[in-house]
């Protein structure tokens, strides 16, 4: 099995001291920060598109003016301010006059609109000519698609327990197509939300693994350096290599790997040059290589799932959202299977 290609390279277990240098540590640290920063920009852009439709969040907020209150005490109030009429004061007579003017203006515009009203065919042509390529393709597919006439008529006759006419069948066929389209659109939105949440989970994993990689590499690098003065000059950065990592008790694999990594990070024998210290360094290199493979394997991009099929969970969640949004859909009592009214067994 080929190893996943990525921005980071593994450390060989043989002849590794020449690789573990200060320059390698800072270049790898910079690479990890750069990858996480690019992923952060991508995640922020995706979340912004999901929440605001691509517009800036600041444009959706109402900017309230900031008032500066004077804390000086007023000893005497100005007499003119008591009898002063407030600005922009509107009296009932002004409101009635404004409503009368608006009514006359609307009547005039209504007469003009009736003369300039386009025919239905002209409106349809105007709509089609102003669609882009993607919208035109979707419109043509939706316009040509129709539900099966026989199945619609059979289903309606079964529910109504009578033969339905042809015009009712055409009406139910059109309404059913619109209803199915709304459910599918909601299912696509649900799928996009699920993919976005998975993207956030992958980003959190990559951030956590990147933080561990910097600690492991720093611990390995400074365990090789013997010059104490040189070590003190570069060791005081933002990466606490002796800080243990947290884990969850219900995740056995993560608990085992994190416990082993914490014991290696907090070990004082790495600074020595005996056989035990070499074994600890090899174990730390092995842990580092595992994290490198995981870091390279993670991908926060969700564009590769754009053409993925809809799942039953998406349709089920879309149906639930549709019922909440419409708030007028009656309960399907005929589907009840004994838990509620038991109408299916009557």
From Swiss-Prot:
Function: Functions as a component of the DNA-binding general transcription factor complex TFIID. Binding of TFIID to a promoter (with or without TATA element) is the initial step in pre-initiation complex (PIC) formation. TFIID plays a key role in the regulation of gene expression by RNA polymerase II through different activities such as transcription activator interaction, core promoter recognition and selectivity, TFIIA and TFIIB interaction, chromatin modification (histone acetylation by TAF1), facilitation of DNA opening and initiation of transcription.
GO biological process entries: positive regulation of transcription by RNA polymerase II; RNA polymerase II preinitiation complex assembly; transcription by RNA polymerase II
Family recorded in the similarity comment: Belongs to the TAF11 family.
The protein's name: Transcription initiation factor TFIID subunit 11
Phosphoserine: modified positions: 236, 238
Gene Ontology molecular functions: chromatin binding; protein heterodimerization activity
Keywords, in A-Z order: Nucleus, Phosphoprotein, Transcription, Transcription regulation
InterPro entries from the UniProt entry: Histone-fold, TAF11-like, TAFII28_dom
Gene field: TAF11
Disulfide-bond pairs as recorded: none
Subunit architecture: TAF11 heterodimerizes with TAF13, but they do not seem to form a heterotetramer like TAF6/TAF9. The 1.2 MDa TFIID complex is composed of TATA binding protein (TBP) and the 14 TBP-associated factors (one copy of each TAF1, TAF2, TAF3, TAF7, TAF8, TAF11, TAF13, two copies of each TAF4, TAF5, TAF6, TAF9, TAF10, TAF12, and three copies of TAF14), ranging in size from 17 to 150 kDa.
Signal peptide: none
Histone-fold domain location: 131-329
Compartments, as annotated in UniProt: Nucleus
Superkingdom of this protein's organism: Eukaryota
SUPFAM superfamilies per the UniProt record, alphabetical: Histone-fold (SSF47113)
